[in-house]
Curated annotation (Swiss-Prot):
It comes from Ehrlichia ruminantium (strain Gardel). ADP binds at G153, V154, S155, R156, T157, S158, K159, S160. This is Putative pyruvate, phosphate dikinase regulatory protein. The lineage of its organism: Bacteria, Pseudomonadati, Pseudomonadota, Alphaproteobacteria, Rickettsiales. Belongs to the pyruvate, phosphate/water dikinase regulatory protein family. PDRP subfamily. It comes from the Bacteria. Keywords: Kinase, Nucleotide-binding, Serine/threonine-protein kinase, Transferase. It is an enzyme of class 2 (transferase). It catalyses: N(tele)-phospho-L-histidyl/L-threonyl-[pyruvate, phosphate dikinase] + ADP = N(tele)-phospho-L-histidyl/O-phospho-L-threonyl-[pyruvate, phosphate dikinase] + AMP + H(+); N(tele)-phospho-L-histidyl/O-phospho-L-threonyl-[pyruvate, phosphate dikinase] + phosphate + H(+) = N(tele)-phospho-L-histidyl/L-threonyl-[pyruvate, phosphate dikinase] + diphosphate. Pfam families: Kinase-PPPase. HAMAP family: PDRP. NCBIfam families: PRK05339.1. The keyword Nucleus does not apply. Bifunctional serine/threonine kinase and phosphorylase involved in the regulation of the pyruvate, phosphate dikinase (PPDK) by catalyzing its phosphorylation/dephosphorylation.
Amino acid sequence: MSNPVVLNLHLISDSTCETVAAVARSALEHFKSVEVNEFVWSCINSYEQIDKIMLTIEKDKYNFIMYTMFDDDIRKYLKQKAGIHEIPCIPILSHVIREISCYLNIKKDPYINTSIGLDDEYFTRIDAINYTIAHDDGQNLWDIDQADIIILGVSRTSKSPTSIYLAYRGYRVVNIPLINSIELSVDLSKMKNKLIVGLTIDIDRLIEIRRARLVSMKNQNNYGYVDYEHVLMEIRETKRICAKNGWPIIDVTQKSVEEIAATIIQYFTKMQH
């Protein structure tokens, strides 16, 4: 088997890097065979900072820069430095801004406030992240009634990364693993005004993921974890529980975390109305 292509992806912004990171990760979903080393450079607003970034870049590797930069002089300097080292340097918003400017025949603002505001939305997001981390993998269910969303599923169905992604969007999430022969410690059927959703996956894909997990943990002797009949029983039980309670179930086999989260948000929004 040939070695995967390794890409050093440098995300540069004069703000938080949230926008450029979201675009970059969505784009890289189309290149599953590429191994990405992500470097995040936020709050970059001086020539000196750009010089330091360039010094850290290993020039003999595959490097790629994606950025958002609103100061024209700093942006030109970044492009110049990247060009000297023959590193692709892509502005993710320039084309969109230019198209809007041309269509409306209005020049873009010379300056926008890119500072991180500590507003209510910020604190809501931080609270959601803290809550979700504390309730990962079925922990601390004593205050599960404070959750917005409850995610169920067998092991390795992207429950945790999906929960964190949703938390970053401001949702308080609990994720609970479904394990054969072990009953849930809480009665979810009595939960009111909570979105409860199950995650399922193709059995062959799940076994493949679990085998890789066992190898990484050097625990290949855990045969039950990857036994076909055992795994099939787990998946069927998840579907049975969700069907019995009328909870939606999402097949995550061909979905990214972003796609899973988007589907859950659609269910949540529909429930709210």
